[in-house]
Amino acid sequence: MAKMALIQRELKRDNLVAKYAKKHAEFKAIAGDVKRSDEERAAARLGLQKLPRNANPTRQRNRCAITGRPRGTFQHFGLARAKIREMAFAGEIPGIVKASW
């Protein structure tokens, strides 16, 4: 299980991304618009730089909802591969059965 501090840090990042999502999208749209003047685009890039570092969505990490494991996490389930295996064998995930051919 991951340390609680790491899980809390990730939750804090999620909150920051949600808080600044609208501003981030506006700045990105202006900075990428070639029809805008160079001054406007430079101002948008500067605005992006002034946002908190953890407000950038690329800094988010997918973690297992149960264990907090950062690697081997399936997006569809939100669980780590080991937990998916345990839960599937126990019959706790509907529609998943052990392969047999």
Curated annotation (Swiss-Prot):
GO terms under cellular component? cytoplasm; small ribosomal subunit
In the record, what terms sit under GO molecular function? rRNA binding; structural constituent of ribosome
Sorted UniProt keywords: Ribonucleoprotein, Ribosomal protein, RNA-binding, rRNA-binding
SUPFAM superfamilies tied to this protein? Glucocorticoid receptor-like (DNA-binding domain)
Cystine connections = none
GO BP annotation list: translation
> In which domain of life is the source organism classified?
Bacteria
**Does the keyword Repeat belong to this entry?**
no
Matching entries from InterPro entries are given as:
Ribosomal_uS14, Ribosomal_uS14_bac/plastid
User: Function of this protein?
Assistant: Binds 16S rRNA, required for the assembly of 30S particles and may also be responsible for determining the conformation of the 16S rRNA at the A site.
Cited NCBIfam families: PRK08881.1
Q: Which family does it belong to?
A: Belongs to the universal ribosomal protein uS14 family.
Assembly with partners or alone: Part of the 30S ribosomal subunit. Contacts proteins S3 and S10.
Task: Fetch the PANTHER family from UniProt.
Answer: 30S RIBOSOMAL PROTEIN S14, SMALL RIBOSOMAL SUBUNIT PROTEIN US14M
Query: Could you identify this protein by its name?
Result: Small ribosomal subunit protein uS14
